Swiss-Prot record:
GO (cellular component) term, any one: large ribosomal subunit
Entries under Gene3D superfamilies matching the protein: 3.30.70.1730, 6.10.250.290
Subunit record text: Part of the ribosomal stalk of the 50S ribosomal subunit. The N-terminus interacts with L11 and the large rRNA to form the base of the stalk. The C-terminus forms an elongated spine to which L12 dimers bind in a sequential fashion forming a multimeric L10(L12)X complex.
Keyword terms of this UniProt record: Ribonucleoprotein, Ribosomal protein, RNA-binding, rRNA-binding
Entry GO MF terms: large ribosomal subunit rRNA binding; structural constituent of ribosome
Protein name: Large ribosomal subunit protein uL10
Length: 172
């Protein structure tokens, strides 16, 4: 590979890293071309970019990232990097699901908003709610609160009317 090509790859990967909310390093040794294509398709469906890059080029691209030194030990063997641009946990869900059926795919490490997660924390990451799920839950909670406010106001007014009615009856 020519030096210009390597520099371009480093620049592209560094740009993706800066845009991504979460990056995931995986080992894919032993996956067939067919399985690798299937995996890329699953990532594409989830809105995740998945790319095979040489470890030395990933290391150079990570230089400006916080916590890059913690990711360095994972840069051994074959490495592919998944970029969670819009949703930091989408890659974890795909990796978890795909690795159940394919033992050759191994999760190495992830970095989300500066925090680094090891290979043993894939289950934790995959069970986290996605951004859209969190937005949906928050909207539901707000909707419930807004819906219950008129009932509370009506109950207070009803109680006040009852209290005034009782006072009026006592004075008669």
């Amino acid at each position: 590979m020519k030096r210009d090509t390597k520099q371009q790859i480093v620049q592209e990967v560094a740009e993706k890293i800066s845009q991504a909310q979460g990056i995931y390093l995986t080992e894919f040794q032993g996956l067939t071309v067919e399985k690798m294509s299937e995996l890329r398709g699953e990532f594409r469906k989830a809105g995740v970019e998945y790319r095979v890059v040489k470890n030395t080029l990933i290391r150079k691209a990570l230089q400006d990232m916080a916590g890059a030194d913690k990711l360095a030990p994972a840069l051994k063997s074959t490495t592919a990097i998944a970029f969670g641009i819009d949703d930091p946990v989408a890659p974890a869900k795909v990796i978890k699901k795909f690795s159940k059926a394919n033992d050759q795919l191994k999760f190495k490490m992830a970095a989300i908003d500066g925090a680094v997660y090891g290979a043993d924390q894939l289950t934790l990451l995959s069970e986290m709610l996605s951004k859209t799920e969190n937005i949906g839950r928050t909207a539901g909670l707000i909707n419930n609160v807004i819906g219950s406010v008129p009932m509370v106001v009506n109950a207070v007014m009803r109680n006040m009317v009852c209290a005034l009615d009782q006072i009026a009856k006592q004075k008669q």
